[in-house]
């Protein structure tokens, strides 16, 4: 969920005022919005304390239509170029900090990005593959003090 929220934050910060839906699109959604969800993912254990997540996210942008219910293609091209700039040219994506943990800034490597524009649907379908290495959370060991040092 941390990486999904991070992808949504990157999109929301560049498309101010455009809704970003996670997991499902509401029945009464209005066009001019994003829908982001995890399509596939794998996790690989690197060693005893580190693992690597390799999620693939689907980003769908539903473009606005005019009064005649026709797609405004120019807006689709602008969104397509902005998404490409966000997820290709930067090569890394900032990751939100884990809940309740103070840590330095973390980044996920962008492995690949592809998109398909469907003018007939008035939508852009993009796939984003990430690579993120994370420490395995360890349980705090409970112990008693042997005594006070004088």
Task: List the predicted regions and their residue ranges.
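Charged, amphipathic alpha-helical segments and their flanking helix caps
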Residues: 1-21, 42-150
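Short acidic low-complexity segments
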Residues: 21-31
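A short, hydrophobic beta-strand-centered structural micro-motif
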Residues: 30-40
């Amino acid at each position: 969920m941390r990486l999904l929220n991070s992808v949504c934050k990157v999109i929301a910060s560049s498309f101010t005022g455009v809704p970003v839906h996670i997991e499902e699109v509401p029945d009464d959604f209005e066009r001019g919005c994003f829908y982001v969800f995890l399509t596939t993912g794998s996790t690989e254990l690197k060693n005893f304390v580190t693992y690597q997540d390799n999620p693939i996210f689907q980003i769908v942008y539903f473009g606005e239509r005019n009064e005649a219910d026709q797609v405004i293609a120019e807006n689709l091209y602008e969104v397509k170029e902005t998404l490409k700039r966000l997820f290709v040219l930067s090569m890394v994506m900032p990751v939100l900090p884990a809940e309740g943990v103070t840590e330095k800034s973390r980044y996920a490597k962008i492995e690949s990005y592809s998109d398909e524009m469907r003018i007939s649907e008035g939508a852009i379908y993009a796939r984003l593959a990430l690579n993120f290495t994370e420490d395995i959370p360890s349980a705090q060991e409970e112990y008693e003090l042997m005594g006070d040092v004088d």
